[in-house]
A protein has these predicted regions:
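Hydrophobic Val/Ile/Leu positions in short beta-strands of Rossmann-like dinucleotide-binding domains
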Residues: 6-8, 76
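Glycine-rich Rossmann-fold phosphate-binding loop(s) that bind the pyrophosphate
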Residues: 11
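N-terminal Rossmann-fold NAD(P) dinucleotide-binding loop
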Residues: 15-16
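NAD(P)-binding Rossmann-fold cofactor-contacting core
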Residues: 24-51
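A short helix->loop->beta-strand "cap" motif at the edges of active sites that frequently abuts
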Residues: 56, 94-97, 120-122
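Rossmann-fold NAD(P) dinucleotide-binding segment
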Residues: 60-101
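Rossmann-fold NAD(P)-binding glycine/threonine-rich loop
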Residues: 85-90, 103-141
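Conserved anion/nucleotide-ligand pocket segment
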Residues: 142-177
């Protein structure tokens, strides 16, 4: 079986965390042996990094990364909106599935992004951008397939989850928080 080759766009806290997990936890789950990070797009090639990695993985042009025909999946964790949208859409149009944790780009351009993914027959996986990474999107899509949900609205994020958890665990009232 051929390995799934991944390109990461962005190497801040989230990008470097993904790199650490995927490169150091290979023995923890068999699927990780089938994944290979082949390129990482960064803003500054000369930046000193606290993480051990092969500098040959680094590239400073995200469009060169997404246009690399050897890369199967793009992980967009660069933040921002317009450039991230362009990278996501171009990746999808190139037939590459995309994983993103970018709340802002999904909130602003989600409809266009999802339509493009559907048209191109690839995936856009954005669950990490919703509810602090709580796995809610896929279960809702699978469990409620026969229903016609048009829209979901709410304020659920990591901070809200933290506050609600503290309230539940310690029976705190909002004034004390």
């Amino acid at each position: 079986m051929r390995k799934c080759k991944i390109g990461i766009v962005g190497f801040g806290t989230v990008g470097s965390g993904i790199y650490n997990i995927l490169s150091s936890a290979v023995d923890t789950h068999p699927i990780l042996k089938e994944i290979e990070i082949v390129k990482i797009a960064v803003k500054d090639l000369g930046k000193k990094r606290d993480i051990q990695l092969d500098n040959n993985l680094l590239i400073d042009d995200p469009f060169k990364l997404i246009n690399d025909p050897s890369i199967d999946v793009i992980v967009e964790v660069m933040g921002g909106v317009d450039l991230a949208k362009d990278i996501i859409l171009q990746s999808l149009k190139l037939g590459k599935s995309v994983v993103t944790a970018n709340k802002a780009v999904i909130a602003r351009y989600g409809e266009e992004i999802y339509k493009t993914a559907s048209k191109e027959g690839v995936y856009i996986l954005s669950e990490a951008a919703v509810c602090g990474g709580i796995p809610i999107i896929e279960p809702l899509k699978r469990s409620l397939k026969s229903n016609s949900i048009k829209k979901m609205v709410g304020i659920i994020n990591g901070t809200t989850n933290f506050i609600l958890s503290k309230m539940q665990m310690k029976k705190l009232i909002i004034r004390r928080l």
